[in-house]
Amino acid sequence: SDEEKDAIGEISNICMGTAATTLYSLVNQKVVITTPVVEITNWDKLTAEYAKPCVFINILYKDGIDGNNVLILKEDDVKVITDLMMGGDGLNPAPELTELHFSAICEAMNQMMGSSATSLSSMLNCKIDISPPEAELVDMAGNIDVAKASDFLDKDFVRVTFRMTIGDLVDSTITVSYT
């Protein structure tokens, strides 16, 4: 319903605001995340919007909430974010993602979603704990096993989309999908 979408949007906005503050501390660049757009979608609709490979970061909720959270970032955005995290200027990121990049983006998302879970825990007055994130490069245009990306993507799910800017280096969309 519209009321449920509004509630999810409001909660997501608070959580991502906290996550943006955490990301700022990791990349030392101003991070701005806009008001979210909330919709019910499915795998086919989602993949139609992504022509290039994307990085899926899957985070399971261990306590307090049932389900998981999948963040979808563009490959180039991950390169810039991880370059900044490793002391670079973000202007000349590596041409290809390596295990070091996946480790760094998982650490960033672990800290961001950890702070987000803490905010959510305060709002709901219950303990919320997350699993360590797992990241993988997913070719959205190819045939992939939906279960490999996340076992909930084979049915309708909630998608929350934010516009995210990081300094003058990243102007992109971050997608968070919830079961």
Regions found by a protein language model. Name each.
Residues 1, 5-178:
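Composition-driven recognition of glycine/serine/threonine/acidic- and proline-rich low-complexity segments
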